[in-house]
Amino acid sequence: MEQLRGLILSGGKGTRLRPITHTSAKQLVPVANKPVLFYGIEAMAAAGIKEIGIIIAPETGEEIKAVAGDGSRFGVQITYILQDEPLGLAHAVLTAEPFLRDAPFVMYLGDNLLQGGISELVERFRTNAPEALILLTPVPDPENYGVAELNGSNTVKRLVEKPKEPATDLALVGVYMFTPEIHTAARAIEPSARGELEITDAIQHLVDAGRRVEPHIVTGWWKDTGRLEDMLEANRLILENVEQRIDGELDAASQVEGRVCIEAGARLVRSTVRGPAIIGAGATLTDCYVGPYTAIAEGCAIERAEVEHSILLAGSSVCGLDGRMESSLLGRNVAIRRDDRQPRAYRFMVGDNSEIGIL
């Protein structure tokens, strides 16, 4: 099999992560202080894939270009491919056909995370040479995913996109491997009821044509980070393996417990950080507590507050809370502070599609 190329899908509107995605691509929201998109690029690079195409949308494409660059920082070459409208994963494959040409390729959904990378799967695809290799995992809510029915354990019988009555609980993970046969299949299908060219229909076309579609049941964790709860869970899973490193400054009254990464330029004053956690460069923690599974990005400031199981994006600040903030995601340059003046009251300025929880 010739050299594989990579295709990462980074379009879409990210409606489930609003209001964060009103101002940023969902694939650039960080998990453990690294954009989700970067995990997919790094997984492809580790598998020996050198040429990667990234599908972008008109609304967020320039931001993704600016952040990911030409790929040199990852040891790969990135080509950006504009998809004018989000008309389905199979439509994205057809949009990328001039880049992919006749090469086999790995398709990776840019807001997905997969434990252990894809190196072994790529090697299996090269060795077994099926027309497609799909990844599956049992989920409690298969009606929200593409679902597979198998003949035994080694062949695919049927694929259905978001079925109302799923026949199995095996959901398609957002990583696929294809030969160029998928282009022919994608051109042969019709749009679904929701007006999209579904990748499940294209793969089903391969099955119906007698092509070999090989399933692989994922044994490690997989996360689609499209919702807040999934983003926080992905952050927790990644931080489980955070590297213990203290490059920032701690005063004598501060302490660090467990696996904590404190990047250069970060400063702790009379504060406690209990890992696993990561504190970004230039962040300042004063008279505060940061609990497990928290990622504080660069330039954040926390003062007289407690934060746990949360993600704070760059430049955000939390000051003077008299309770613990947990299970939260703060966008860039967000400020949360308490005014001690009387009478005490809540004062908000909240954008469309926001959510505030007061416990």
Predicted regions: what is each one?
Residues 81-83, 135, 216-218:
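Conserved beta-strand termini and adjacent loop/short-helix elements that scaffold enzyme active sites
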Residues 12, 111, 138, 227:
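Active-site glycine-centered loops adjacent to acidic/histidine catalytic or metal-binding residues
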Residues 114-190:
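Conserved core of the sugar-phosphate nucleotidyltransferase
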Residues 51-57, 136, 311, 329:
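Short internal beta-strands
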Residues 1-8, 16-22, 29-30, 34-109, ...:
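Conserved N-terminal catalytic core of the sugar/cofactor nucleotidyltransferase
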Residues 1, 155, 181, 188-359:
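Left-handed beta-helix
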Residues 12, 59, 180-181, 229:
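Alpha-helix/helix-capping structural signal
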